[in-house]
Regions:
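Core alpha/beta nucleotide-donor-binding catalytic domains of modification enzymes
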Residues: 1-203
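An accessory alpha-helical subdomain
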Residues: 206-216
Length: 216
C-alpha cells in the first residue's frame, strides 16, 4: 500500500501527465533531503531512474561527503549512478557570473548532455512547494513581471518537477517515516545569498501571518 505522501505525489504526476511507466529518467541527486526523497518516491512508484550527482568542489570535505553518500545510497537501492566534477569558481570567473549562476549553468548543461548519452527521456529535479514560493518572491524582488509571479512549471522542456505539490515539511516527514537519512549542505543554512535570505528570514515571517502560505 502506498504511503499518503506517495499517493499525493502520484496524483500530481497523473494530473499533470508528467511521467510514463515505460520511460527512463535522469534524477538529479545532491544527497540533500529533497533529492533523496525524490529518489525514494520514484522507486516506490516503480519508475525507472538513473541518478546523477554534481560535485562543484566548493565545500572541500563536505562536497566529498555528499558524493560518497549519494554513491552509497544508489548502490544500496540498485540505481545506476553517475557523477561529475566541476571547477565552479574557474567557470564563474571566466564567464563573469556568480557562483550560484555558474553552478546552475554547469549542472543543467551537463544534465542535458548526460540525458542524451544514456537515452533518458527527461530530467527529474526535486523542487517542491517551498522552493516555488521562494522563486515567486525572488522574482517579485527582482521585478521580473507577471510571468515571474507564476512560479515554477511542473514540466519545462525536459525538466520535470514531481514534488511541486508537497512541502519541505512533508518531505522530511516522509523520509523520517521510512528511516531514510540524508546530508545537509551547510551553505544553505547561511543567509548570504538572496534565495537563502528568503528561505531563512522572509518565509518564516510570512508564515507567522499565514501558516499555509506555501500552499497558495
Amino acid at each position: 500500500m502506498l504511503s499518503s505522501f506517495a499517493q499525493k505525489v502520484k496524483a500530481f504526476i497523473a494530473e499533470n501527465q508528467l511521467l510514463q511507466p515505460e520511460s527512463t529518467y535522469l534524477l538529479a541527486l545532491s544527497g540533500g533531503c529533497d533529492s533523496v526523497a525524490l529518489l525514494r518516491i520514484m522507486i516506490e512508484l516503480n519508475y525507472h531512474v538513473a541518478a546523477v550527482h554534481c560535485n562543484f568542489q566548493l565545500r572541500n570535505a563536505e562536497s566529498k561527503r555528499d558524493e560518497m553518500f549519494c554513491e552509497g545510497l544508489c548502490w544500496s537501492l540498485k540505481v545506476p549512478f553517475h557523477r561529475v566534477y566541476f571547477d565552479t569558481k574557474a567557470y564563474a570567473s571566466l564567464h563573469h557570473v556568480s557562483i550560484e549562476m555558474a553552478a546552475r549553468e554547469l549542472r543543467y548543461d551537463y544534465f542535458e548532455k548526460l540525458r542524451k548519452d544514456i537515452s533518458a527521456d527527461d530530467i527529474l529535479v526535486a523542487h517542491h512547494q517551498d522552493d516555488n514560493i521562494e522563486t515567486v518572491l525572488l522574482n517579485l524582488i527582482r521585478g521580473t513581471g507577471i510571468q515571474g509571479l507564476l512560479g515554477m512549471k511542473p514540466k519545462n522542456g525536459h525538466i520535470i518537477r514531481p514534488l511541486l505539490s508537497v512541502s519541505r515539511k512533508e518531505i522530511e516527514q516522509y523520509l523520517s517515516s521510512i528511516h531514510q537519512d540524508y546530508v545537509t549542505d551547510s551553505s544553505n543554512l547561511v543567509a548570504d545569498v538572496m534565495r537563502n535570505k528568503i528561505r531563512l528570514e522572509v518565509i518564516p515571517l510570512l508564515k507567522t501571518l499565514n501558516p499555509s502560505v506555501s500552499d497558495n
